[in-house]
Amino acid sequence: ALGRKNFIISNSNRDAVTWIDSWPNWPVACNGLNVFGPKSSGKSHLGAVWQSRSKAVQLNNPIVDIMKVPEILNNKKNVIIDGFDESWPGIPILHLYNLIKEREGFLIIISSKPLAQLEVLPADLSSRLSTLPVVEIKQPDDELIKQVMQKLFEDRLIADVEIFENPIKRTYTQDGKINFNGGD
């Protein structure tokens, strides 16, 4: 369930949710947004919320053929790119960006790092992307994890919420994964 009502808000994602909820009433010169954060932090879920509201085209894989850009966009004007990194060829994205701007549409780019920390080429694309506001979704905090676990239990009709009264300890593995252990 990737709808807005299923997206749980906490301090770790509140800024990003505020941006998405305020669309299309973004500042006048703002035609897009870069949402970044760690893996499994809710970026794609929040992107799906915006994609549904905006009727945007969603791209999860790099565009390699510049000639396909108009076909990909079809008659739409909003695009969400999920999983953007330095491996995406820049020329098709530059063409896509210009077409979105021409149609007065919006572009959301979801990435693990802020676009400014990526080596985006060509320079024209890097310059255009640098104008996008940037919002971070942080590592899920304890309150968010508690609410997500509670929702998962409720979805499975396990209604004994008393188990959430005990603190949950988190430890991080070297690869950034979270291990959960019961509290003391």
Regions found by a protein language model. Name each.
Residues 115-130:
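Short regulatory helix/loop adjacent to the ATP-binding pocket of P-loop NTPases
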Residues 132, 147-158:
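Conserved AAA+ ATPase "sensor/coupling" helix adjacent to the nucleotide-binding pocket
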Residues 145-148, 159-171:
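Short conserved motifs of the RecA-like P-loop NTPase core
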Residues 28-46:
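Walker A/P-loop nucleotide-binding motif
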Residues 1-15:
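Dynamic helix-loop-helix/coil hinge segments at AAA+ ATPase domain boundaries and subdomain interfaces
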